[in-house]
């Protein structure tokens, strides 16, 4: 237990030293802020964009607060996903290249201790950053649009946090596979993008994939209730996260040298 606590403290301090605990929440807040403001001011943006015939009027139906929140989640599913992957991609690869891993593993530290400590702290940072951005989006939606349900917001936040954990786990797995930071990022982004595309292309046959959690969160925002296969989606998402985490530990143990 002492070993795990020491590693957790190390990872948390590393988050401060690298600036990750500062730039990631700020970046997520910018992502969350952009969508509500863009939608709200879209008529003015189009009107002042020029190249419109004289006398032409633009008809723009203002979406509901829930629809804006769904649009914001879609934004997090692209830019947010990349930001989380970039924050995780060097977790193992950088320390191996700098010789830090060899120093840590020369002490009574197991592969499980090493990987799990990184997974826990990176997940906490990712969820905190997403919550900051999503919470800011909710604030502006309530300010600029119709009142959005807080219970729906909280439920969608909790569900999407599980997707953030999956993204973190995928990025960490990529960092254990490749020593190159770029290759690790490509692996993490490729895996999460493939899962998302599969759910979009095969909506009926891919309900068990973790990206279905995003659809569940959107359904709750719009309808205030769970969609079909909610239990299966939740169960298999947790299972996929566990399998990826176990794979990362297994891959780390197979290193011939750190």
From Swiss-Prot:
Entry superkingdom: Bacteria
InterPro entries: ABC2_NosY/YtrC-like
Name of this protein: Uncharacterized transmembrane protein YxlG
Subcellular location: Cell membrane
Keyword Acetylation: no
Keyword set includes Aminoacyl-tRNA synthetase: no
Induction, as annotated: Expression is sigma Y-dependent. Induced upon nitrogen starvation.
GO molecular function: ABC-type transporter activity
Organism of this sequence: Bacillus subtilis (strain 168)
Membrane topology of this protein: Multi-pass membrane protein
Listed transmembrane segments: 21-41, 73-93, 119-139, 153-173, 182-202, 229-249
GO CC field: plasma membrane
UniProt keywords, alphabetically: Cell membrane, Membrane, Transmembrane, Transmembrane helix
Pfam families reported in the protein's UniProt record: ABC2_membrane_2
Main location: membrane
């Amino acid at each position: 237990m002492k070993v795990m606590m020491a590693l957790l403290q190390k990872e948390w301090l590393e988050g401060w030293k690298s600036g990750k605990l500062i730039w990631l929440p700020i970046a997520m807040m910018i992502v969350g802020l952009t969508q509500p403001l863009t939608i709200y001011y879209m008529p003015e943006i189009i009107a002042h964009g020029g190249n419109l015939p004289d006398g032409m009027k633009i008809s723009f139906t203002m979406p509901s607060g829930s629809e804006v929140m769904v649009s914001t989640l879609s934004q997090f599913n692209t830019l947010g996903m990349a930001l989380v992957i970039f924050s995780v991609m060097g977790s193992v690869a950088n320390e191996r290249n700098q010789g830090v891993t060899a120093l840590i593993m020369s002490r009574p530290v197991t592969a499980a201790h090493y990987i799990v400590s990184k997974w826990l702290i990176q997940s906490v940072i990712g969820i905190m950053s997403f919550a900051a951005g999503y919470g800011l989006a909710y604030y502006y939606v309530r300010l600029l649009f119709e009142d959005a349900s807080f219970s729906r917001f909280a439920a969608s936040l909790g569900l999407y946090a599980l997707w953030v954990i999956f993204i973190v786990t995928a990025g960490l797995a990529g960092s254990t596979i490749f020593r190159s930071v770029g290759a690790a990022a490509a692996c993490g982004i490729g895996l999460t993008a493939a899962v998302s595309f599969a759910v979009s292309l095969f909506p009926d046959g891919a309900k068990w994939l973790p990206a279905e959690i995003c659809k569940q969160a959107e359904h709750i925002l719009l309808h205030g209730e769970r969609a079909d296969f909610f239990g299966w989606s939740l169960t298999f998402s947790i299972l996929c996260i566990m399998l990826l985490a176990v794979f990362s530990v297994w891959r780390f143990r197979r290193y011939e040298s750190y």
